[in-house]
UniProtKB/Swiss-Prot annotation:
Cofactor(s) the protein requires to work: heme b
SUPFAM superfamilies to which the protein is assigned, alphabetical: a domain/subunit of cytochrome bc1 complex (Ubiquinol-cytochrome c reductase), Transmembrane di-heme cytochromes
Species whose genome carries this gene: Pteronotus gymnonotus
Keyword Metal-binding included in the entry's annotation: yes
Subunit structure comment from the entry: The cytochrome bc1 complex contains 11 subunits: 3 respiratory subunits (MT-CYB, CYC1 and UQCRFS1), 2 core proteins (UQCRC1 and UQCRC2) and 6 low-molecular weight proteins (UQCRH/QCR6, UQCRB/QCR7, UQCRQ/QCR8, UQCR10/QCR9, UQCR11/QCR10 and a cleavage product of UQCRFS1). This cytochrome bc1 complex then forms a dimer.
Primary role: Component of the ubiquinol-cytochrome c reductase complex (complex III or cytochrome b-c1 complex) that is part of the mitochondrial respiratory chain. The b-c1 complex mediates electron transfer from ubiquinol to cytochrome c. Contributes to the generation of a proton gradient across the mitochondrial membrane that is then used for ATP synthesis.
Annotated residues for binding of a ubiquinone: H201
Name of the protein described by the UniProt record: Cytochrome b
Keyword Mitochondrion attached: yes
Free-text comment on the cofactor: Binds 2 heme b groups non-covalently.
Keywords: Electron transport, Heme, Iron, Membrane, Metal-binding, Mitochondrion, Mitochondrion inner membrane, Respiratory chain, Transmembrane, Transmembrane helix, Transport, Ubiquinone
Family as reported in the entry's similarity comment: Belongs to the cytochrome b family.
Length: 379
């Protein structure tokens, strides 16, 4: 008799995605981050749901409601810090996941890659709106500065900003709508994840060698289920240590001061995971130019499949391209550091050089390195 998981209409979908799915036998631990992201999303939705039960999205009470969650609600403090630091874990996994896609040429599956870029934008939007909700100083001023960037759009900019604010400044209407969108977006992200997986399972997973692996596959269960569970346990251990030992390590102390429109913090900066984009934004002295560079710093991922000039898919056997990739990683770390520094010499010039280098590596140096490798291999 055929097993029910192979015949039942619903279980069959789960079976084809998580049990009998053929996976290349050579995939390494870098392929674990997809499942880690799913675990992060689950943690964020669960903790967020319980936080939303006690949070009030009103400028008069938002800050106090977060304080109330931490002080008076049973295990409220752990929910709040799991949610805040869970976002950091989410972005660590997200950036590694994108990096793995770049390194091993996973972007050649263009539909999966493009849905992934859409997911990246959605997660960034969700994280930004979530940062506004505690209504501390950095929440208020971060919201003011970042939404104000839209005023750089010619002709409709000012009207667009006031439409988003729901008034002439960031106020009650802004906070209420940000809470509504922050609650809604994770479910849209979950739906996009299903589409992402749908496209992935159309082609099958890539592998470190970058060559077709049809003759050499293993079933997803038990090999990769065990591997994924180990990865999830390691990530949850790291998250627990962060939450229990230094919950405010990645936060900003200014956010423990209630929002005050009359008092500007000395250094307005976003959470650490946006600092690289913030540094690119600040490195251009023109407002519209900065906004364009900010958007393009992420949107540039969409042109990477078009810039693939190598005859090989993966970077595993391409030392020149590997050098370019790790130079890009170092450059992004430099930008992250610069984004957290004040706007003064020498940080300004370092930021400008790192920003130019970021676009140069992706648009020029990586395709050139690939062409050189083709030539060296006489292809």
């Amino acid at each position: 008799m055929t097993n029910i998981r192979k015949t039942h209409p619903l279980l069959k979908i789960v079976n084809d995605s998580l049990v009998d799915l053929p996976v290349p036998s050579s995939v390494s631990s870098w392929w674990n981050f997809g499942s880690l992201l799913a675990a992060c999303l689950a943690v964020q939705i669960l903790t967020g749901l319980f936080l939303a039960m006690h949070y009030t999205s009103d400028t008069a009470t938002a800050f106090n409601s977060v304080t109330h969650i931490c002080r008076d609600v049973n295990y409220g403090w752990i929910l709040r810090y799991l949610h805040a630091n869970g976002a950091s874990m989410f972005f660590i996994c997200l950036y590694i996941h994108v990096g793995r896609g770049l390194y091993y040429g996973s972007y050649m599956y263009s539909e999966t890659w493009n849905i992934g870029i859409l997911l990246l934008f959605a997660v960034m939007a969700t994280a930004f709106m979530g940062y506004v909700l505690p209504w501390g100083q950095m929440s208020f001023w971060g919201a003011t500065v970042i939404t104000n960037l839209l005023s750089a759009i010619p002709y409709i900019g000012t009207d667009l900003v006031q439409w988003i604010w729901g008034g002439f400044s960031v106020d009650k209407a802004t906070l209420t709508r940000f809470f509504a969108f922050h609650f809604l977006l994770p479910f849209i992200i979950a739906a996009l994840v299903v589409v992402h997986l749908l496209f992935l399972h159309e082609t099958g997973s890539s592998n470190p060698t970058g060559i077709p692996s049809d003759p050499d596959m293993v079933p997803f269960h038990p090999y990769h289920t065990i591997k994924d569970i180990l990865g999830i346990l390691m990530m949850l251990t790291a998250l627990s240590m962060l939450v229990l030992f230094s919950p405010d390590l990645l936060g900003d102390p200014d956010n423990y001061i209630p929002a005050n429109p009359l008092n500007t913090p000395p250094h307005i900066k976003p959470e650490w995971y946006f600092l690289f984009a913030y540094a690119i934004l600040r490195s251009i002295p023109n407002k519209l130019g900065g906004v364009l560079a900010l958007v393009l710093s992420i949107l540039i991922l969409a042109v990477i499949p078009l810039l693939h000039t190598s005859k090989q898919r993966s970077m595993m056997f391409r030392p020149l391209s590997q050098c370019m990739f790790w130079l890009l990683v170092a450059d992004l770390l430099t930008l992250t550091w610069i984004g957290g520094q004040p706007v003064e010499h020498p940080y300004i010039i370092i930021g400008q050089m790192a920003s130019i280098l970021y676009f140069t590596i992706i648009l020029l140096l990586m395709p050139l390195a690939s062409m050189m490798e083709n030539h060296l291999l006489k292809w």
